[in-house]
Amino acid sequence: MKIILLFLAALASFTVHAQPPSQTVEQTVRHIYQNYKSDATAPYFGETGERAITSARIQQALTLNDNLTLPGNIGWLDYDPVCDCQDFGDLVLESVAITQTDADHADAVVRFRIFKDDKEKTTQTLKMVAENGRWVIDDIVSNHGSVLQAVNSENEKTLAALASLQKEQPEAFVAELFEHIADYSWPWTWVVSDSYRQAVNAFYKTTFKTANNPDEDMQIERQFIYDNPICFGEESLFSRVDEIRVLEKTADSARIHVRFTLTNGNNEEQELVLQRREGKWEIADFIRPNSGSLLKQIEAKTAARLKQ
């Protein structure tokens, strides 16, 4: 009897898990596009959770891309793939053609006009997949190519650039950072430690509060968020490295003194506190001659803003 009950419980669990979507593919697609009206709110393609219109793997790719993007910058998702646009009026969905691949996959070829009075038509294919009892977008293929492939390609390119910076010795790693400082192919937030990156993100969240002193706040935000701390600001202002000197070094930590020149002729210097985690060197802090730890400054300013 116990075995039968266990079997029935397992069967019930499987039935719930395998419950088919409540809407058909076409109903789902039409529901998505009906929100592309001037008096409606279009769904956000990068949305996660219950309101997501995309599959888990697209969400993972977009989340990684967002994490690889510097605070305040826009990542790969700078337009809406559903309408293949950045702006729309009363979108007119002219046709939806469904091809069911299997029980959990289908292609929806859609043709629409972004604006009601627009003569230009857009045709693209929504790759649909059934997840958690509903149909969601697993990819969009248009004359631009595949959305998923484009995001993954950009992520892989950035990760490859970051991997290429790694060297066995900490001083060689620092030299490589400056060698490629103006490549714009890697975010500085991914050559710092988790603690430093979290501190920057925590401070960035405070920038959405009303500023009491806009000019002063803007200067601080530029220093802590928008300036590349490796070279004291905009990468294009970096000219050359004058000295890289090892102050301390162990197998998994180091302090490196760096002196360099900017394009305006100014000389800057600082100490980079390095640590090696999972075989990769990362910057744990920046020690400036006159102001000390940049990490502590960020944490202190964040705490002060949160008390306001």
Swiss-Prot record:
Gene3D superfamilies per UniProt: 3.10.450.50
InterPro entries per the UniProt record, alphabetical: DUF3828 (IPR024289)
Keywords, comma-separated and alphabetical: Signal
Signal peptide span: 1-18
Pfam families: DUF3828
Superkingdom of the organism of origin: Bacteria
Name of the molecule in the record: Uncharacterized protein YqhG
Source species: Escherichia coli (strain K12)
